[in-house]
Protein backbone atom coordinates (compact mmCIF):
# COMPACT_ATOMS: atom_id res chain seq x y z
CA UNK A 1 0.00 0.00 0.00
CA UNK A 2 1.31 3.47 -0.87
CA UNK A 3 0.01 6.88 0.05
CA UNK A 4 1.11 10.45 -0.49
CA UNK A 5 0.22 11.03 3.15
CA UNK A 6 3.33 9.05 4.09
CA UNK A 7 6.60 10.95 4.50
CA UNK A 8 8.02 11.89 1.10
CA UNK A 9 11.49 13.29 0.34
CA UNK A 10 11.69 16.97 -0.63
CA UNK A 11 11.33 17.78 -4.32
CA UNK A 12 14.64 17.85 -6.19
CA UNK A 13 12.95 18.95 -9.43
CA UNK A 14 10.20 21.52 -9.89
CA UNK A 15 6.65 20.50 -10.75
CA UNK A 16 7.11 21.93 -14.25
CA UNK A 17 10.26 19.84 -14.76
CA UNK A 18 8.49 16.71 -13.54
CA UNK A 19 5.49 17.40 -15.77
CA UNK A 20 7.76 17.98 -18.80
CA UNK A 21 9.35 14.57 -18.17
CA UNK A 22 5.92 12.91 -18.02
CA UNK A 23 4.74 14.76 -21.15
CA UNK A 24 7.84 13.57 -23.02
CA UNK A 25 7.08 9.97 -22.04
CA UNK A 26 3.48 10.36 -23.19
CA UNK A 27 4.64 11.94 -26.46
CA UNK A 28 7.06 9.06 -27.04
CA UNK A 29 4.21 6.55 -26.64
CA UNK A 30 2.00 8.60 -28.95
CA UNK A 31 4.57 9.33 -31.68
CA UNK A 32 4.52 5.87 -33.29
CA UNK A 33 0.71 5.70 -33.37
CA UNK A 34 0.41 9.25 -34.70
CA UNK A 35 2.96 8.57 -37.45
CA UNK A 36 1.18 5.33 -38.33
CA UNK A 37 -2.16 7.11 -38.64
CA UNK A 38 -0.60 9.85 -40.81
CA UNK A 39 0.98 7.24 -43.08
CA UNK A 40 -2.38 5.47 -43.30
CA UNK A 41 -4.08 8.68 -44.42
CA UNK A 42 -1.41 9.26 -47.08
CA UNK A 43 -1.54 5.69 -48.42
CA UNK A 44 -5.34 5.55 -48.59
CA UNK A 45 -5.59 8.98 -50.25
CA UNK A 46 -3.00 7.94 -52.83
CA UNK A 47 -5.10 4.86 -53.65
CA UNK A 48 -8.21 7.06 -53.98
CA UNK A 49 -6.33 9.52 -56.23
CA UNK A 50 -4.89 6.76 -58.41
CA UNK A 51 -8.15 4.86 -58.90
CA UNK A 52 -10.23 8.01 -59.37
CA UNK A 53 -8.02 9.08 -62.27
CA UNK A 54 -9.17 6.09 -64.32
CA UNK A 55 -11.95 6.80 -66.79
CA UNK A 56 -13.79 3.62 -65.86
CA UNK A 57 -13.41 4.04 -62.08
CA UNK A 58 -16.49 3.21 -60.02
CA UNK A 59 -17.25 4.95 -56.75
CA UNK A 60 -17.39 1.60 -54.98
CA UNK A 61 -13.75 0.92 -55.87
CA UNK A 62 -12.53 3.83 -53.74
CA UNK A 63 -15.21 4.08 -51.07
CA UNK A 64 -13.52 1.81 -48.53
CA UNK A 65 -10.16 3.58 -48.94
CA UNK A 66 -11.78 7.00 -48.55
CA UNK A 67 -13.58 5.81 -45.41
CA UNK A 68 -10.34 4.45 -43.94
CA UNK A 69 -8.56 7.72 -44.68
CA UNK A 70 -11.34 9.67 -42.94
CA UNK A 71 -11.18 7.43 -39.86
CA UNK A 72 -7.41 7.74 -39.65
CA UNK A 73 -7.61 11.50 -40.11
CA UNK A 74 -10.06 11.68 -37.20
CA UNK A 75 -7.51 9.82 -35.06
CA UNK A 76 -4.74 12.21 -36.14
CA UNK A 77 -6.87 15.26 -35.32
CA UNK A 78 -7.87 13.84 -31.91
CA UNK A 79 -4.29 13.04 -30.89
CA UNK A 80 -2.96 16.35 -32.24
CA UNK A 81 -5.58 18.44 -30.43
CA UNK A 82 -4.94 16.57 -27.17
CA UNK A 83 -1.18 17.02 -27.47
CA UNK A 84 -1.53 20.74 -28.20
CA UNK A 85 -3.85 21.16 -25.22
CA UNK A 86 -1.38 19.51 -22.85
CA UNK A 87 1.58 21.42 -24.35
CA UNK A 88 -0.06 24.77 -23.59
CA UNK A 89 0.03 26.35 -20.15
CA UNK A 90 -3.03 25.15 -18.20
CA UNK A 91 -5.92 27.40 -17.32
CA UNK A 92 -6.61 27.41 -13.61
CA UNK A 93 -8.79 25.99 -12.25
CA UNK A 94 -8.21 22.93 -14.44
CA UNK A 95 -11.18 20.88 -15.69
CA UNK A 96 -10.57 17.25 -14.71
CA UNK A 97 -12.84 15.76 -17.40
CA UNK A 98 -11.16 17.56 -20.29
CA UNK A 99 -7.73 16.57 -18.98
CA UNK A 100 -8.73 12.92 -18.62
CA UNK A 101 -9.96 12.79 -22.21
CA UNK A 102 -6.76 14.40 -23.49
CA UNK A 103 -4.77 11.60 -21.85
CA UNK A 104 -7.18 8.97 -23.16
CA UNK A 105 -6.94 10.32 -26.74
CA UNK A 106 -3.15 10.15 -26.62
CA UNK A 107 -2.62 6.90 -24.74
CA UNK A 108 -5.49 4.64 -25.83
CA UNK A 109 -3.96 3.88 -29.28
CA UNK A 110 -0.61 2.78 -27.81
CA UNK A 111 -2.38 0.73 -25.13
CA UNK A 112 -4.29 -1.09 -27.88
CA UNK A 113 -1.09 -1.60 -29.87
CA UNK A 114 0.44 -3.27 -26.79
CA UNK A 115 -2.50 -5.69 -26.61
CA UNK A 116 -4.30 -3.88 -23.79
CA UNK A 117 -6.81 -1.05 -23.50
CA UNK A 118 -7.44 2.24 -21.74
CA UNK A 119 -11.04 3.19 -21.09
CA UNK A 120 -12.87 5.75 -19.01
CA UNK A 121 -15.59 3.78 -17.25
CA UNK A 122 -19.12 4.72 -16.33
CA UNK A 123 -21.39 5.96 -19.09
CA UNK A 124 -19.00 5.90 -22.06
CA UNK A 125 -20.42 9.10 -23.56
CA UNK A 126 -20.32 11.17 -20.41
CA UNK A 127 -17.58 13.39 -19.12
CA UNK A 128 -17.72 14.44 -15.50
CA UNK A 129 -16.66 18.04 -15.36
CA UNK A 130 -15.18 19.40 -12.18
CA UNK A 131 -12.57 22.05 -11.53
CA UNK A 132 -9.60 21.23 -9.32
CA UNK A 133 -8.14 23.67 -6.81
CA UNK A 134 -4.53 22.47 -7.24
CA UNK A 135 -2.44 24.11 -9.98
CA UNK A 136 -2.93 22.71 -13.46
CA UNK A 137 0.51 21.22 -14.01
CA UNK A 138 0.41 19.38 -10.68
CA UNK A 139 -2.90 17.80 -11.68
CA UNK A 140 -1.52 16.88 -15.11
CA UNK A 141 1.64 15.47 -13.50
CA UNK A 142 -0.19 13.23 -11.04
CA UNK A 143 -2.74 11.96 -13.58
CA UNK A 144 -0.13 11.39 -16.28
CA UNK A 145 2.37 9.65 -14.01
CA UNK A 146 -0.33 7.35 -12.60
CA UNK A 147 -1.51 6.39 -16.10
CA UNK A 148 2.02 5.72 -17.31
CA UNK A 149 2.61 3.48 -14.29
CA UNK A 150 -0.55 1.53 -15.12
CA UNK A 151 0.20 1.32 -18.85
CA UNK A 152 3.70 -0.04 -18.17
CA UNK A 153 1.94 -3.31 -17.28
CA UNK A 154 0.62 -3.63 -20.86
CA UNK A 155 -2.84 -4.79 -19.77
CA UNK A 156 -6.38 -3.46 -19.59
CA UNK A 157 -6.63 -0.16 -17.72
CA UNK A 158 -9.92 1.23 -16.45
CA UNK A 159 -10.40 4.60 -14.83
CA UNK A 160 -13.36 6.55 -13.58
CA UNK A 161 -14.04 9.74 -11.64
CA UNK A 162 -16.31 10.46 -8.69
CA UNK A 163 -17.22 14.07 -7.97
CA UNK A 164 -18.43 15.10 -4.53
CA UNK A 165 -16.82 17.39 -2.00
CA UNK A 166 -13.59 16.16 -3.57
CA UNK A 167 -12.77 14.77 -7.01
CA UNK A 168 -11.53 11.19 -6.89
CA UNK A 169 -10.01 9.47 -9.93
CA UNK A 170 -9.80 5.68 -9.69
CA UNK A 171 -7.31 3.81 -11.89
CA UNK A 172 -7.35 0.02 -12.03
CA UNK A 173 -5.06 -2.37 -13.87
CA UNK A 174 -6.06 -5.91 -14.78
CA UNK A 175 -2.42 -6.98 -14.39
CA UNK A 176 -1.68 -8.41 -10.94
CA UNK A 177 2.09 -7.95 -11.17
CA UNK A 178 3.21 -5.81 -8.23
CA UNK A 179 1.60 -2.74 -6.64
CA UNK A 180 0.48 0.21 -8.76
CA UNK A 181 2.39 3.30 -7.62
CA UNK A 182 4.03 6.54 -8.72
CA UNK A 183 7.54 7.78 -7.98
CA UNK A 184 8.47 9.43 -4.69
CA UNK A 185 8.97 12.76 -6.51
CA UNK A 186 5.45 12.67 -7.92
CA UNK A 187 4.07 11.67 -4.52
CA UNK A 188 5.91 14.58 -2.90
CA UNK A 189 4.53 17.04 -5.48
CA UNK A 190 1.01 15.68 -4.94
CA UNK A 191 1.36 15.88 -1.17
CA UNK A 192 2.52 19.51 -1.34
CA UNK A 193 -0.54 20.39 -3.46
CA UNK A 194 -3.01 18.66 -1.14
CA UNK A 195 -3.59 15.76 -3.56
CA UNK A 196 -3.85 12.35 -1.93
CA UNK A 197 -2.37 9.39 -3.81
CA UNK A 198 -3.37 5.98 -2.50
CA UNK A 199 -2.33 2.73 -4.13
CA UNK A 200 -3.32 -0.77 -3.14
CA UNK A 201 -2.67 -3.83 -5.28
CA UNK A 202 -3.74 -3.24 -8.88
CA UNK A 203 -5.66 -0.03 -8.14
CA UNK A 204 -4.85 3.56 -7.32
CA UNK A 205 -7.02 6.47 -6.25
CA UNK A 206 -6.12 10.13 -6.74
CA UNK A 207 -8.09 12.55 -4.58
CA UNK A 208 -8.07 16.18 -5.72
CA UNK A 209 -9.40 19.21 -3.79
CA UNK A 210 -12.38 20.84 -5.50
CA UNK A 211 -12.23 24.44 -6.67
CA UNK A 212 -14.70 26.36 -4.52
CA UNK A 213 -16.15 28.41 -7.37
CA UNK A 214 -17.00 25.62 -9.82
CA UNK A 215 -19.63 22.95 -9.42
CA UNK A 216 -19.51 19.52 -11.00
CA UNK A 217 -21.68 18.93 -14.01
CA UNK A 218 -22.19 16.16 -16.52
CA UNK A 219 -22.25 16.78 -20.23
CA UNK A 220 -22.62 14.51 -23.23
CA UNK A 221 -19.37 13.59 -24.89
CA UNK A 222 -19.80 13.24 -28.63
CA UNK A 223 -17.09 10.65 -29.21
CA UNK A 224 -17.67 6.94 -28.66
What kind of region is each of these model predictions?
Residues 89, 124-129, 156, 203:
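Conserved catalytic core of two-component sensor histidine kinases, primarily the HATPase_c ATP-binding
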Residues 2-11, 153-156, 176-224:
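Flexible, glycine-/charge-rich segments associated with ATP-binding catalytic modules
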Residues 119, 158-160, 198:
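Short beta-strand patches within cytosolic ATPase/nucleotide-binding catalytic cores
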Residues 117-133, 164:
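Conserved catalytic submotifs in the C-terminal HATPase_c
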Residues 2-26, 34-74, 131:
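Histidine phosphotransfer helical core of two-component systems
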Residues 60-117:
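Conserved DHp (HisKA) dimerization/phosphotransfer helix of two-component histidine kinases, i.e.
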Residues 21-43, 131-157, 182-192:
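Conserved ATP-binding N-box helix of the HATPase_c
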Residues 136, 154-173:
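Short beta-strand/loop element within the Bergerat-fold HATPase_c
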